[in-house]
Amino acid sequence: MGGKTKKHAMRLFDRIAEKYDLLNRILSFGMDTKWRKRVVELILEVNPEKVLDLATGTGDVARLLKRKAPHLEITGLDSSSKMLEIAEKRLKDGEFIVGDAHNLPFYDRSFDAITVAFGFRNFSDRRRVLRECRRVLKRKGRLVILELLPPNTKRFTGKIYSFYLKTWVPFVGGLFSGDFHAYRYLSTSVLNFLTPDQIVEMMKEEGFEVSFEPLFFSVAGIFIGDLIW
C-alpha cells in the first residue's frame, strides 16, 4: 500500500470513528462482542503480563482484557487518531499509540501476547505485520487474530452472506453513518479477503504454530498463532 492509499484508509477510519462500533454490529450479525470475549479467553490462557492490541480501534478488546485481568499492562495501537480518542475516553488506564502495524515502535520481545480484531484484512502487507508481531513477541508468545471471512459461495449460507455484504451492509451502514463509500469499502474488504487456509499457511510460513476456530458458519474466524521457541 502506497503512502497515498494509507492516508486514504486513515481518513476513512477517522470519518467513521463515531459509528465504527455500529459497523461491527452490522457486519457480524451482532455477535462481535461474543467473539471478542473468546479472543480474551485465548489470550489469558498464556497468563500474559503485557499485551499489545493492534488495530485497537475504539479499544473494545483492550477494555475486555482489562475487565477480566485488571493487572494487565495493555498497549493499543491504531493508525486512526479519531478512533484512539474514543478508546482513551473509554479506558483511562490503557496506553494508546498512533502508529503503523507494519513498523511497530517497540523493542524486540516486548509483549507476551498480541491481539488483532477485525483489522488484519486492512493491512496492506500482512506478511510484514506478522513478522513485526513475531519480532515484538516474547518467547512462547501468542498472537490471536479475529477476522471476518469471505463467503464460500459454494454453500447456500455463503451465498446469503455474500448478498448481505454486497447490498445490506453498504445500505444500512451508509444510512446510519451518512458515509456510503466507507461502508462499501469495508464490505469489499471482506469479500476480497484471504481464505482461512491462506491465512493459516501464511502464519505458519512466518514462524507460528497455528490453529483455527471458525465462527458462525465461517462468517468469521479466530486464528491462534503460538511461537514454539
Swiss-Prot record:
The catalytic activity, as recorded, is: a 2-demethylmenaquinol + S-adenosyl-L-methionine = a menaquinol + S-adenosyl-L-homocysteine + H(+)
Q: Quick one: which pathway? A: Quinol/quinone metabolism; menaquinone biosynthesis; menaquinol from 1,4-dihydroxy-2-naphthoate: step 2/2
Q: Which UniProt keywords apply?
A: Menaquinone biosynthesis, Methyltransferase, S-adenosyl-L-methionine, Transferase
InterPro entries of this UniProt entry?
SAM-dependent_MTases_sf, UbiE/COQ5_MeTrFase, UbiE/COQ5_MeTrFase_CS
**Binding-site residues, S-adenosyl-L-methionine:** 58, 78, 100-101
Q: What is its EC number?
A: 2.1.1.163
Q: What Gene Ontology molecular-function terms does this entry list?
A: demethylmenaquinone methyltransferase activity; methyltransferase activity
One BP term from GO: menaquinone biosynthetic process
Question: What family does this chain come from, according to its entry?
Answer: Belongs to the class I-like SAM-binding methyltransferase superfamily. MenG/UbiE family.
Q: What does this protein do?
A: Methyltransferase required for the conversion of demethylmenaquinol (DMKH2) to menaquinol (MKH2).
Under which name does UniProt file this protein?
Demethylmenaquinone methyltransferase
